[in-house]
Amino acid sequence: MRVAVFLSGSGTNFTAIYEEGKRLAGMGGKPYAAIAAVFTNVPGCKGALKAAGLGIPVLALSSKLFFSALGRDPDDDEVRDYYDAAALAMIEEICKPDLIVLAGYRRRLGGMLLGRYRNRVVNLYPGDITKDYLVRGVDASVQAIRAGESSIKCTVYLERPHERFGPALVQSEPVSLDGYKEEDAEAMNELIRSEGEWRIYPYAVHNLIAGGRLGVDPDDNVYLDGKRLGKEGYQYVG
């Protein structure tokens, strides 16, 4: 399976996915996702530099300069599609990806790209997307503490146009928040990354998606090995 990774920052989830693919490839005979290209809207970001150092083709198109040159609002849906079309043109010269993985990509994708790659664009949220208390602009860990939660799960999900979250594919094991307070957001987020994100994202991409075990019907119901899952998706156990 050919994968294009979109990123904007340090690329820690990209690294986790790459390392697991390398491990699986070394074992031989197991299906895995090969990262064929990395795209970034922030040229020179740490994740892009990591990918280049690994010999992976890196494609960069500054979203800041793109929208500035057009003199248009970067959140305008039409202009969003212009940018996405330019990004896809660059990527598809390198490969025709079977899957697009958003790994800390800080731009919302438009309807054109998501329609063209329907059910083939995945993202990760460092919290439980089924919770009804989630708001934008506040760390998931802080929201969990405010809601009285003693633990948190992170979620791999499918991207959908005009929706914050599409259907959940996989959730991590609960990550304990015992002893943490709101002001400990940075420490909580690091814990969630190490005990949640870096475990389930590689597992979802390689073992479940590349392994051909996940399916989605027209009503956005998710199936694992032909069995319909609940709204929380598959519950990962490491």
Q: Where are the model-predicted features located?
A:
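One-carbon transfer enzymes
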Residues: 1-238
